Regions:
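Catalytic domains of lipid- and phosphate-ester/thioester hydrolases
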Residues: 1-176
C-alpha cells in the first residue's frame, strides 16, 4: 500500500485497506491509499496494463521458469487480453520452443502482431507490435553460459522461488 499523491492523508492504511484488497470493493484511484501489485495474480510479465493502454510497441522479456516450453505466461496473457479487452495477439512460438532432443531453441525472440479492436471515440482499430523474448539457449552462447549450464542443467529455467542468486548465476542470466 502507498499513499495516493493526489490525496493528502495523515492516517495509516489500516484494516479497511485489507478488506478492500480481499473483496475488491472500493479499489480505485480515488482512495487515499493505493494498492500496488506486480500483477502476478493475472499474468507475470506486466503486459496486461500495457495492452489496456493500447501501446503500439511492447518489449516483453518472459523470465518465467518454463522447462517444458508450455508458454503458460504468454498464453495466459493471450487469453486475458482477448476476454477483457478484445485484443487479439498472434504468437507463433515454434521457433522459440525447445527441441526435445537438443534442448535448444532456434531463436530467443519472436515479433508478433497485436490487434486492438475499435474501442469507441479516440480509440480506433489499430495494430501494434510486441517483441517477445524468451529465456532460451540456441547453441551459440558464450563459454560462461555453457559452463553454467553444465553445472546447472535447469538453466535458464531454474525455479523462480530462488531469490538468492550467486554471482555466477546472476552473471549467466545477465548475459543470456
Amino acid at each position: 500500500w502507498i499513499s495516493n499523491p493526489k490525496i493528502a492523508s495523515k492516517k495509516s492504511p489500516g484494516f479497511l485497506c485489507l478488506l478492500r484488497e480481499m473483496t475488491g470493493i472500493g479499489m480505485n484511484e480515488n482512495n487515499p491509499w493505493l494498492n500496488l501489485s506486480d500483477g502476478g495474480h493475472i499474468e507475470n510479465m506486466g503486459l496486461y496494463e500495457l495492452l489496456r493502454r493500447r501501446c503500439k510497441f511492447i518489449v516483453c522479456v518472459d523470465g518465467e521458469a518454463d522447462p517444458r516450453s508450455t508458454f503458460e505466461g504468454q498464453l495466459t496473457l493471450v487469453r486475458h487480453a482477448q476476454i477483457d479487452f478484445g485484443v487479439r495477439l498472434e504468437p507463433r512460438l515454434d521457433d522459440i520452443r525447445l527441441d526435445p532432443k537438443s534442448t535448444l531453441s532456434r531463436t530467443h525472440s519472436h515479433l508478433l502482431r497485436i490487434h486492438y479492436p475499435d474501442a469507441g471515440p479516440g480509440k480506433p482499430k489499430a495494430i501494434g507490435l510486441m517483441l517477445y523474448l524468451k529465456l532460451s539457449l540456441t547453441g551459440d552462447e558464450t563459454e560462461l553460459l555453457k559452463r553454467y549450464r553444465s553445472i546447472s542443467p535447469d538453466f535458464p529455467h531454474e525455479s523462480t522461488l530462488d531469490q538468492f542468486y550467486t554471482e555466477e548465476q546472476f552473471e549467466a542470466y545477465r548475459q543470456l
